[in-house]
Curated annotation (Swiss-Prot):
Quaternary state and interactors: Homopentamer.
Domain of life: Bacteria
Primary residence: membrane
Keyword set includes Nucleotide-binding: no
Physiological role: Channel that opens in response to stretch forces in the membrane lipid bilayer. May participate in the regulation of osmotic pressure changes within the cell.
Gene (name only): mscL
Pfam families linked to this entry: MscL (PF01741)
The protein, known as: Large-conductance mechanosensitive channel
One GO cellular component term noted in the UniProt record for this chain: plasma membrane
Species in which this protein is naturally found: Salmonella paratyphi C (strain RKS4594)
Length: 137
């Protein structure tokens, strides 16, 4: 089997394709959550605590000197990323809870009794024919 053919078979397996779709959707979901935090949650939160913009929180380790830029730790961006993480983690937690609940309901449903085998059907027909013959005599 050629290398390219093996790679194609590997790449087209169900699990790999599902994983790729999950990664793409996860990246898009991450952008949505980041926008939710940065553009919707943080501005009112900053307004509630005296109009503070968290992105502006920073600690200067060394001032700029000539052509050398300042060394700054932007801990406000870190705070915003922590909010992002908490919201994503909560959303994933809720989604997993819902999926587990649906799976539990499916597991609780009683399974349909198995259909009789061909032998059982034939034996039943033979029994019925014998009963019919006995009733005639």
């Amino acid at each position: 089997m050629s290398f390219i053919k093996e790679f194609r078979e590997f790449a087209m397996r169900g699990n790999v394709v599902d994983l790729a779709v999950g990664v793409i959707i996860g990246a898009a979901f991450g952008k949505i959550v980041s926008s939710l935090v940065a553009d919707i949650i943080m501005p009112p939160l900053g307004l509630l605590i005296s109009g503070i913009d968290f992105k502006q929180f920073a600690f200067t380790l060394r001032e700029a000197q000539g052509d050398i830029p300042a060394v700054v730790m932007h801990y406000g961006v870190f705070i915003q990323n922590v909010f992002d993480f908490v919201i994503v983690a909560f959303a994933i937690f809720v989604a997993i809870k819902l999926i587990n609940r649906l799976n539990r309901k499916k597991a609780e449903e009683p399974a349909a009794p198995p259909a009789p085998s061909k032998e059982e059907v034939l034996l039943g027909e033979i029994r019925d024919l014998l009963k019919e013959q006995n009733n005639r005599s």
